[in-house]
Each structure stands twice: as structure tokens, then as C-alpha cells.
Amino acid sequence: IFDPVGAGVSSLRNDMTKEIVENYPLALIRGNMSEIKAITKLIDLDTENDSVAKGVDVAASDVISKDNLDINGAIVKALAKELNTVVIASGPIDIISDGEVIFGLENGDEMMPLITGSGCMLTTIIGSYVGANDPLLGGITACALMTIAGENAAEYVRENDLGTGSFRT
């Protein structure tokens, strides 16, 4: 499982990301849409790609929405096909592809991106599920689990008038 944190931000991160995706077999790549687009640039994959990385957080123009779902889905699918792996772009709508099919999951809560490390938590859960399952099925299941847990945690926070530091289930 590879989480390309901050891909597209610095030459060090770009060089390491390129080396990993080109030289090591990966069961799955999970990143935000800016990180996924950065990988497509690094390997010269021909996609419509206007992303500008801005650190470890997704660029505002790369936040996955219904308006850009088709183009972002095509990018995720093309990268998965090119690298022969499962690719997950996480966001308000998670896009998951093995290069043949594309799935979109629209669960979660707008509070989730405010929790530092939520993407890393998702990658850890994905690792648990992919270790025991097909990478595509494991990735879908892990994303569903994380986003539904996020909905439950957000409900708890709102019902108890708490802040994001109490975001848990």
C-alpha cells in the first residue's frame, strides 16, 4: 500500500514517489486527488491534468465533486491501468479503480478533512482490509468503513456540542 503524501510538492517527494511507483509492485495507491494527479505527471501519463500541489492537503481545484467526478474518475482509472494496481483518490467522493471499473463512494462528513491525519488513518484501514482481501474489494470496504464511521463521529460531536478534538466513534 502506498500513500504518496505530498507528491507534487518537492523534488525529494517527487523523486521518491516516482521511484516507488516505477520500481516496486503495489497492491494499492491511496492519496488525495492532488497527489494522484502528481503521480500522473511524474510518470508522463497523458491525462487532462491541471493540478498544482499545495502541501499535504488537496488543492481547492482538486477537491472531488459531482462537477468534476467524470474527469477525476478517468484520471484515477488511467493511473490504475497504467500501473496495474488499485488506485483510490479520497475526498468528499472517494474514487476507486482497478483500471477496468470505477467506483464512487459518497459518504462521510465535511468535518473529516479538518481532522489531521484522516487520510493516513484511511490508508492504515485500507492496509488491514487489503491484507486479507482482493485489493479492489478491500479498498472499497475500507473507504466505506472510514466514511460511515466519520458520519457517526460527526453526529456525536454535533449532538454533544463538541469540537473536532472529540471526533471519534
Residue ranges and their predicted role:
Residues 1-4:
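Short beta-strand elements of ligand-binding domains
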Residues 6-10, 95, 112:
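Short, small-residue-enriched loops and turns at beta-alpha junctions
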Residues 11-102:
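Conserved phosphate/ATP/ADP-binding segment of small-molecule kinases
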Residues 11-14, 33, 69-73, 120, ...:
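Electropositive phosphate-/nucleotide-binding environments in soluble metabolic enzymes
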Residues 33-35, 93, 109, 143-147:
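Glycine-rich beta-alpha junction loops
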Residues 38, 116-145:
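Short, small-residue alpha-helix embedded
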Residues 105-116:
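Short pre-catalytic strand/loop immediately N-terminal to key active-site residues, enriched for Gly-Thr
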Residues 148-169:
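Charged C-terminal helix
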